[in-house]
């Protein structure tokens, strides 16, 4: 499969009058090419006890280790579904696992943030409450809010700096190799 740079992805699919294709498209077209291994699960949405959109598992049958990544996409920001909000931010004492990373594509940046750091920020800024209705989403977290917290951090990657993106994925790939 042909590899595409982030700036090309943004030009063809994000900076358009058409509807943005969404996170599953972003995973398939751009993110999968960044990993040295094929994920064990894509977009499991909580099925089989897996959290996140991209999941790598240990090949050792006696190990339950996994590395999971939640992916979000949105021009100005993004929100979380009812289940994601309730399980990951409100009922944090549950035995369900949490993602290891958040990868978020916004208008101007790609954010690759360790989940714990992102989760702490989201809870601090949005003070999420349990969503009781059948449908509903969390409050939106905006690009500018992420920038204010991570302005000088390596979590925020300028779209034009593909080499910085590679450095972040090298780190994640090393973690995947250790599974």
What are these model-predicted stretches?
Residues 1-179:
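Nucleic-acid endonuclease domains
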């Amino acid at each position: 499969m042909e590899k595409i740079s982030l700036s090309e992805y943004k030009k063809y699919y994000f900076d358009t009058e058409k509807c943005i294709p969404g996170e599953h498209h972003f995973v398939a077209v751009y993110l999968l090419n960044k990993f040295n291994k094929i994920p064990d699960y894509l977009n499991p949405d909580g099925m089989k006890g897996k959290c996140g959109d991209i999941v790598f598992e240990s090949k050792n049958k006696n190990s339950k280790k996994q590395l999971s990544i939640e992916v979000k996409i949105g021009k100005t920001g993004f929100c979380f579904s009812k289940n994601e909000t309730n399980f990951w931010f409100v009922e944090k004492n549950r035995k369900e696992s949490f993602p290891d990373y958040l990868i978020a594509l916004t208008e101007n940046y790609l954010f690759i943030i360790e989940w714990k750091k992102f989760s702490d920020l989201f809870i601090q800024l949005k003070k999420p409450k349990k969503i009781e209705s059948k449908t509903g989403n969390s409050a939106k977290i905006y690009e500018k809010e992420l920038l204010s917290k991570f302005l000088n951090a390596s979590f925020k990657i300028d779209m034009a700096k593909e080499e910085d993106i590679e450095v972040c994925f090298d780190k994640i790939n090393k973690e995947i190799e250790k599974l």
